[in-house]
Amino acid sequence: MKEAISALMEKLKTHSLTFKEVLTFIETYYQHQPTAFKNGEAYNEATQNQGSAKVFAFAQLNNLPAEDTLYLFAEHYQAVLATPDGTDHQNIRQFMQHGWPGVVLEGQALLAK
């Protein structure tokens, strides 16, 4: 798994993968359970923003640092970087501001297959 994650991160850092491809990678190894979570000042119900829930849970389970976690958002992270004063992609913006201390998953969003 460590090698697969390293290869994933290399591709993300060269902007070679989309967010959808990241989610497909995560879903290859984990089963998702809808989970509510808090991220900084943003609260997400179990029916909202589950792509972000998958990313945060995956990054936590694999002890990824905040910087690598942001790369998992692929083109959405790049869009936030391009528009620092924007209001879209609040989960990315909140994570950039609050980091891991701001993320609280209210359950186990991912289970290993």
Task: Explain the meaning of each model-derived region.
Residues 2-5, 19, 23, 66, ...:
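Alpha-helix initiation and N-capping motif
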Residues 2-9, 108-113:
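Long, charge-rich, low-complexity intrinsically disordered regions
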Residues 11-34, 107:
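Short, charge-rich, low-complexity alpha-helical interaction segments
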Residues 25, 29, 72-76, 95-98:
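Short acidic/histidine-centered micro-motifs embedded in hydrophobic/aromatic stretches
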Residues 38-41, 108-109:
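Short coil/turn segments at secondary-structure boundaries
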Residues 40-90:
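Amphipathic protein-protein interaction modules
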Residues 87-113:
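Long, compositionally biased
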